[in-house]
A protein has these predicted regions:
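A short, hydrophobic C-terminal helix/tail in secreted or cell-surface proteins
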Residues: 256-262
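Acyl-donor-binding surface of acyltransferase catalytic domains
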Residues: 27
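Cys/His-rich microdomains that often coordinate metals
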Residues: 17, 30, 47
């Protein structure tokens, strides 16, 4: 069974209830056969190990390149330290295929083989940009992948491994321009709790704007952003106080009184 159909304990940090390909808590990736006490996320039964053939990306060939690239890239220190930790422990060739059932793109010419989602997902950056160029005549002639173009990614800390190791290696392998920098941020929590539909802490942006001005939320998030990967907590009591004191209060204080108006 592909990784997302398996759950268990992370073999790296011991976090429970993690998927079979990566850990949300420590960010590590691993083979689904490495996860501790695995169960099927569909049936809850214990999976049986069977042999199957896969395609691999020879990531080990890029180990020296990745070390040098990280050294010369101004990635946040906490992320860079974690990436170097992964590199120093020895990276393995990357399994880029999954067997059916899977939700990725089917590999042409193969029987029930799919590209692993983190192999094809970053390619979407290239495909989306190419599509944008096709419908916008003003930028159609620009080569966005030459060495003079700067490329920046803004991502969540849970996908740093894929964007800071796999993605640069892919770009290097096809001789495309590398990211100028990658900025990672933490998760968004609600009143100190992880977003969850079952716990009623999941908020859609479309629902939020029905009650509040989106500019208030942008300001609140901007006031909490930093160069770290700490989670940002949307605490509604703090949100109310901050908006009232910083924005609404300031507006009222600086507004002219009736006698001052012309």
């Amino acid at each position: 069974m592909p990784d997302r159909y398996i759950k268990g304990t992370c073999p790296k940090c011991g976090a429970k209830d993690q998927y079979g390909d990566s850990c949300e808590k420590c960010g590590a990736t691993y083979n689904s056969t490495e996860i501790i006490n695995p169960i099927s996320s569909i049936s809850g039964s214990k999976p049986i190990i069977k042999s199957t053939e896969h395609f691999f990306f020879e990531l080990k060939k890029f180990e020296k390149f990745l070390s040098e690239w990280l050294e010369n890239t101004d990635i946040q220190p906490s992320i860079k330290n974690k990436l170097n930790e992964w590199l120093s422990s020895g990276i393995q060739d990357w399994d880029i295929t999954r067997d059916s059932p899977y939700f990725g793109f089917k590999i042409p010419g193969e029987n029930n083989k799919y590209f692993y989602v983190w192999m094809d997902a970053p390619i979407g950056y290239i495909a989306s940009l190419n599509e944008y160029k096709n419908i916008n005549s003003e930028v159609k002639a620009i080569n966005y992948w030459n060495e003079d173009i700067e490329i920046y990614h803004f991502i969540g800390k849970d996908i740093a491994y894929f964007h800071c190791l796999f993605w640069p290696a892919i770009l290097r392998g096809i001789d495309y321009n590398l990211p100028t920098n990658i900025f990672c941020h933490g998760f968004l929590t609600i009143n100190g709790m992880k977003m969850s539909k079952s716990r009623n802490t999941f908020i859609r942006a479309s629902d939020f704007v029905k009650k509040f001005d989106p500019e208030f939320l942008r300001y609140y998030f901007a006031s909490k952003l930093s160069n770290t990967i700490e989670d940002i907590d949307l605490n509604f009591e703090d949100f109310r106080k901050k908006i009232n004191s910083d924005l609404i209060g300031c507006l009222l204080y600086t507004s002219p009184s009736p006698r001052d108006r012309v």
